[in-house]
Amino acid sequence: MPVAPHELRDTIKSRDLGLFQCIDLLKQHNDNIGVHHQLVQKLYSYSYDELEFFIPQFIQLLVNFETDSMALEDFLLHYCNQFPHFSLIVFWYLQAFLFELRNEPKSYSFQTVRKFINKLQNILFNVETSFHIRGPEFRENMQPALILCGSVASAFSSPLVNEYALPIVRSQGKQQKSFVFKLASFQKSLTRNLTMKNQRLSADAITPVISDDDSKVSNRIQESQRLKTKYSKKKISAALQLDDSENYTTDEEELGYVQTLSRPKIREMKYTEVEENLKINTIIRSKKNRSKTTVNSISFFSDTDQSASMEEYNRSAQSLPELVRTRSRLDLYSSESEAALGTSRNSAELIISKKKFMGSEVKTRPYKELLKILQVNYSKKETSFIMSLQNISLRLSSVPKVARLSALRAELSIINESILPSEIDIPQLLPVTSNKNKKFHKILKLNINEACVLNSAERVPYLLLIEYLSDEIDFNPFSDQNQKIINDCVRKPEVKPNDQISGDDDTSVVSSIQEEMFLDNNASENYNEDGDLGEISLLHSRSSSRDWAKSTPGSPVARSSQEDEKFYGNVSSTTGGTIESSVLADQMRIASLMLQQLESSGQSNTQQFVSIRNRIIESMISLQDQFDFIDYETLKELKTDEQDAGKRKLENDFKLAEDWNEKKHRIRKSSIYGHLENWDLCSVIVKNGDDLPQEAFACQLISLISNIWKKHKVDFWTKRMKILITSANAGLVETITNAMSIHSIKKSLTELSIENGENAKGRIFTLKDYFQKLYGSVDSSKYVKAQENFAISLASYSIICYVLQIKDRHNGNIMLDHEGHIIHIDFGFLLSNSPGSVGFEAAPFKLTSEYVEVLGGLESKAYLKFVDTCKNCFKALRKEWGQIVSIVELMQKGSSLPCFNNGDNTSVLLQQRLQLHLSDEEIDSFIEVYLIEKSVGSMYTRLYDQFQMITQGIYS
């Protein structure tokens, strides 16, 4: 039913309009530009936390709901400019959409994602875009032009009309409606550029051959004059650019001139002489300039006066940026190169130059640009860190299971050495810090010993413990630490990808490694006839170079280590030497890569293959024991009971089952950063899988339902899980601490009782046995409290499972925490899909006789509490049914997620399950008879548990 315009206006202005109601109105009125703009203006009134929660819905509106309005895009770009966390989350979601739409390159959705993601790349990875390039503010659009003319004419009688019209005209005027003018101007500029390029080549070709001495002086003078002239012309022409395709030329000479002006006189003369010698009798450009052009799109400062056409060209480019993953060790090689060339200065000169340079960039650049440098530095390091974590999981999948833990530790050690500690945190998973008055966290290191590979049928997820400093970093360009970062970013030497040992080109890495193994005479003396990798000093030369760099006062490595020592304390005595750890990591990585090559050689049936494979695996296992060790004596002191933790860790769950506070205390005591006051620990799972976006959506729905219950003051309990999507099939999952799956509880208790001779018949332990073992007798206060927690959480998740049709509820996907709460995980099947497309789980939700036994029977107080909680939760959801149905209706359009297999019927069936036609009295009967009685001891539930026990070994 259409709403009257004045009613819609009052609704938008109302303070009671919730954020999701505003999003729903955006979906309904996406064809009305004026209403769309008013609704987007309303978005600015909501808090950052609310807006970040609904980022997937904003992206869905932008991509799958076609509209002529530019308001939502401008809003997202504005927030991406303002909040680094917001921009990264949007960027990763767009990458997932881009992968999903890869087979539809001509669709509206793909074109929208492509254009927006390229604009976002300029925000994330480009410093100069916002300050030196201004795109056209008004294009050839009829409608905004007419509105502009009309508002100017009506301003004489109604001056305030401009306040309403200006935002719409400004936003809609940037929209490109036709490519006719763009193509025409592009052809003109292309012809002009080719003509200029040919003239320049002709001039270089007919240059008379003169003596070297004369050419050095004359060419230097001519080049300087030419650059000055061109530099001034460029600045004038850039200011006159109106169309986005006017100029596609590069400004290498301009960049060279600017950099030359900033160099000391001696360095200027040396570089100019080298460059002039390269130009004699040739038209080939110097390698120095060519390398700068190659990395122009990802460097911090490229062509400072690049035209607006290059910005638009980058936006329309099909490819994503290749981020340069700079490593701290790479600064070492530049120092060695300067020493070899005789151009390095002594330590006294370095100290003087450092004092002169320190703060110069802060003084000469505007505040917004300094802020942008820090934000770009954060974005580059963050994306590089996340990509490194994702690549580990992919590489582990090609490594045999017995060697995966060794390979994982090697990979994590390399990340610790090359990236961390750094200005990096994890959006969403760590506490929210994107508010203006809060600082960001800073990741210090990945705990290698506590990392473990989790069991999975196809993928290789792994558990990661991350040490970080809470509220440690910000974007204040005037702090001492950030001034160092700014100066390092501006002075940072460009790095060739070949110098990175952790690069993606595994073949070249292994080739160079093998060459070093078999050609280095020093290394050949260190291994025996068997060629055990554990005894090969593969990186002796790099170890020596690290020693040299650390002993050289002026080297970057020495400076960084000295600064770290001042801030973090003297940690060398604790680590036992970072050089040995780095060599071990490199050796493990080498062995892992060689093992991957061996597996892909296609000779797995030969005896030689098996022999080599076994030797490599044995070497990796022997190497893994040489990493940082666990202090078991300290561990025993920290334990409050007499139970041996090693006996209980039968599976991965036991890695998670250790009390979180005890684990933090133990790790902090052994950490080199543990003495810092704001030290903290975070546990995440790095996971690859096609169902991760669906799991993230399920967690969002559960959080939305929990918010509804909280609003209506319902007694409920749910665990709010967080999943950070970093690509179409990868992400980080928050670890549930102090909890174990019911499968692991049953299996561990049963096997331990058999091992101790207490269970000769092999009876499987029940949940009640576990509760009594953990909380004491049935009448104890501790047991009663845990029983109540179990009842409330069981009721909450039961209603969620029914409403959202969450399936695959075997005991491996249901957990219990240390307080007795039940927690559901793994939401690969919900709304409209089920395991194997077979309706095994026909019961409304899982309510086994074992659960009833824990509650104390059908007449117990805890069971009645369970029934009442079910009723209250279901009634509250019916009152807010519009939110749940609308968000599913919004997300199902154009989605390829398996949970939307039913298409538009998905939201229809969801609404039907809420039984909106029944009264509250009828709902009580519906819950008791249809939901609970059909679920108690359901035959379908028992069959599914038995099926999982037989096929997957999951205890029922």
Swiss-Prot record:
Keywords: ATP-binding, Kinase, Nucleotide-binding, Nucleus, Transferase. The keyword Coiled coil does not apply. Residues 658-939 form the PI3K/PI4K catalytic domain. One of its GO terms (molecular function) is 1-phosphatidylinositol 4-kinase activity. The keyword Glycoprotein does not apply. Residues 1-120 form the PIK helical domain. It is found in: Nucleus. Its EC number is 2.7.1.67. Residues 545-573 are annotated as: Disordered. Pfam families: PI3_PI4_kinase, PI4KB-PIK1_PIK, Pik1. Its main location: nucleus. SUPFAM superfamilies: ARM repeat (SSF48371), Protein kinase-like (PK-like) (SSF56112). Acts on phosphatidylinositol (PI) in the first committed step in the production of the second messenger inositol 1,4,5,-trisphosphate. Belongs to the PI3/PI4-kinase family. Type III PI4K subfamily. This is Phosphatidylinositol 4-kinase PIK1a. The gene is PIKA.
